Every structure is written in C-alpha cells, then in structure tokens.
Amino acid sequence: MGIKGLIPFLSEKVPSSISELSLESLSGESLAIDASAALYQFTIAIRDSSYFSSLVNSKGESTSHIYGLMNRCSKFLEYGIKPVFVFDSKPPELKTKTLEKRRQQREEANASLKKAISEGDKESVKKLVGRTVKVSKEMNESAKKLLRLMGVPVIEALEEAEAQCAYLVTKNLCRFVASEDTDTLVFGGAFLLRNVASSSSKKILKVDLQKVLDGLEFNFDQFIDFCILCGCDYCDTLEGVGPKTAYSLVKKYQNLEEIVNFKGGDYDDFKEAKEYFLSPKVNEYDENSVKLGTIDPEGLTEFLVQENNFSKERVEKFIEKLLKFKTKKIQTSLLSFLTAPQHNNKAKSSNKRPREPKALDCKPNTYGSGKGTNVVKKESSTIKKDEIDLTAEDLFCEPSNSDNEEDDRGRVDKNEDLFKKSENETNEIKQNQFKSKSDEKKKQEEHHTIEFNFNHRKVILIDDDDDEVVTTANSEKMNCGKCLIYYFLQKLIK
C-alpha cells in the first residue's frame, strides 16, 4: 500500500519532485525492484486483458507472472538496464493488523467477483479482479528460479522488500528503487520509480526524495512523522488526518508525540512504526550479489517448456533475444573502452547528467551503523564464481554446451567487425606518435592473434608465424593495433 495519498499530495504541493521518464532513458542504470509488487502488476495485466482468467500450466498453476517477468526482463536487457529483484521474507509483527485487513478485503472482493461473473457484469469484473490477486509463495519461488536461469540477480530480504531495496540504494549497489509502494521513500530510498513493471505505454514516474524534503521544508525525521500521520502499514491512523492535515500538524508542532497526544491517539504504536522506518531489519549484501550471471539456455528450456508448457518455438526466440542483447551490450561497452583516449583532452560535455544526491544526504540513520540498526550479513551463496558485470561477464563467461576447455575459448575474429573498427580508430589516435616506426614493425600487425581463456580470465597474444605466445605488450612501442587492444584488455581484467 505504501503511504496513503502521498503521490497526489506531492503532485500538488511539490510538483518538481516528480518527473516522467521513459524506460529507454534508464539505459546503463541498475534498479532494485520490489519483486512482489512487480509480480502483482504482471498478474493483474494478464487478468485485466481476459477479465478474470490467468495463464496456467498443465498442473493448474498460474504462469501469468512468469510470462510478465520474461517480457519485462527482456525489455530491461534490451535497453541495457540491470534489474535486481528483491523478494519479501517474513513480514514484521507491526504489519499483522494490516495483513489481516487485506485478507478480509480479498475475501469480500472474491465474493463480489463471483457475483459479477455470474451476472456477466464485465465492468465490475474488471474493477474487482485486482483486489483478489495475492502473490503466493509458489509464485515467488518460480519467479526466483526463472530469474536465476536468466542470470538476473535475486536478493532475499530479511523482512520487507521495500526496506531491502532502500538499503541497496543507500549502499550504492543500485541506483533506483522500482516499486509501487511509496514507503520506500520513508525507508530512505533516494529515488523511487513507479510503473516500471507496467506496460510500455505508461510513463515511468520518478520521485526524488531530496526534492521532496526541500519542497516541503522538512528534515528526514519530520518527513517520517508526516508519512506516518498520512497512514502506513505499521500503525493505525488518526481520525480525520490526511496528507494536508498531517502537513499542517508537522509544521505546527514539529513533534510526532505532541501531535498524537493532541489528537488522542496511542503514541506507542506510532513510536514503534517510526523506529521501524528508521531501523528496519535488512540483510547485508555486497557488489558481488548484484552482478549479472550467465544465461542457462538448457535450464530455461526445461523450466519454461517442460515444466510450464510454454511454446518451445517462442522460448527459443526468447533465449536468442537474451543472448543477442548481452552480445550487443558488450560490443558497445568494449568499443567505448578502447576508444576512450580520444576524449581525454576534450572539455566535458555540458549535457552530461550530473550525479544525483545519495539517500545518505538526507537520512540521519544509515544501515549498518549506529544504534538500533538491524543489518544481518548475507553470504552471496546464490552467485556463481563466474558471475561478473555485464561487460566483463560476456567476455569471460560466454555460454557453452561443451565441457572441453578448448571449446570455451573464443577468438577475437568472432567480433571481427568490432575489432577492425576499434583498431582503425586506435591507430588514427596513435598515428602521430608512431609514424616513425619501420614498415617491418607495422607488418607484425598481421601476424598477431588475440585469444581469450574464459576459465582463467586471461588474454593471450599469439604470434601466428611460429605459434609462440607473446608474454608482453610494450605500451611504448604499440604500433601494432592488436597489441594495443591486448594491452587495454589486460588493464580491463585486472
């Protein structure tokens, strides 16, 4: 649910804190995605399109969330976006009342839905269908399995996914939180993205926490008080208090206890809610936990086709697209790396997007330090040894169906066009520096081959005339284009 009425209030009071984005504009960014919220959106989208039915496999298990997850992850990778899916665990005790209330609301909605279906009232069905959906444990587990087979990072929250997402942003492991729940902001997430899991026709909304604080003229502690008074999942609300009244009360009293006592509420409940927002229980992760892994084509085929009855032809096309997007990304990244020197002596572009403030700039209590924090160190046991960043991972972890080490090695000429282009640009940059070199030295350029040893993450330069391995590449005598590429690749993998 999040904070009641927060977005409409901010749209009116601090419109500059909310902006619209396209999915393409997030290229190169990493998103901490609230998995439960995303799976809910995927399921709703399928059920909305058919009024009340879901996609199911031969066992009668819902697969709507799998279908939605496949499509959205495909888009993320196509645009060079790194998704990190964060899954809820056991909810905190403070949320018990809220969860019970939601259960009762679902039961009532189910009864109304059955009646609307029997009467053929399609409009009522469409309104009610979303209220009956619940993301089950089985749906979460199947989603995790799919993501891992795709090489997409999976993070397990200690309790609330929103708090864990905010932690990842606070620790600079991800740039944005993608969720429909606005309490992510109250947990300290610097940037909240909404509608990320919705259809591509919907604009993504970005909420900037620092701009919210500046516009409301609140410090972070006052913002928490304001949001709790608006209504959250962890305590009851005060009668007659919405966002506008809450804003006025915080401005006047600037103290949550005084406000609650003035309105005749139980401050202990509000105090516990505030303490949880300031010090939620989260698992500790490092950068290895959010790195993209390898795609498992065989595992994906078995899971999607055999276990969940997806079309084999469509699954093959899906896997082909995933591999294509990863290859495209590495080519772009490698080319940028090799041609970077030509920009060294130029002024920086005035259009470059400035780095936005971190959550730490506005949150007084940070995860992992200070009194009352609840950080539990989590080993990244789900991450394989060869799972590394997108750019490096495609260099050293290309999927292979063979156990033979020889088959795991790839030659540069597989990307011949890329290296020719890079070589020409590099030689143009260096031509003045090396124009005095002899023709004999230049001829060596045609007799060198670069090989990758994927298992050991090494780059090898070979003299084709006598198959001898060249152990060094002299950076001061680099008239050979392939020697230059070798030199940069050595720098890349160190």
UniProtKB/Swiss-Prot annotation:
CDD domains assigned: H3TH_FEN1-Euk, PIN_FEN1
Swiss-Prot/TrEMBL cofactor(s): Mg(2+)
EC number(s) stated in the UniProt entry for this protein: 3.1.-.-
Gene designation: FEN1
Family statement drawn from the similarity comment of this UniProt entry: Belongs to the XPG/RAD2 endonuclease family. FEN1 subfamily.
Protein name per the record: Flap endonuclease 1
PANTHER family from the UniProt entry: FLAP ENDONUCLEASE 1, FLAP ENDONUCLEASE FAMILY MEMBER
Maturation and modification: Phosphorylated. Phosphorylation upon DNA damage induces relocalization to the nuclear plasma.
Disulfide topology: none
UniProt keyword Mitochondrion present: yes
Organism domain of life: Eukaryota
Chain positions covered by the region annotation Interaction with PCNA: 330-338
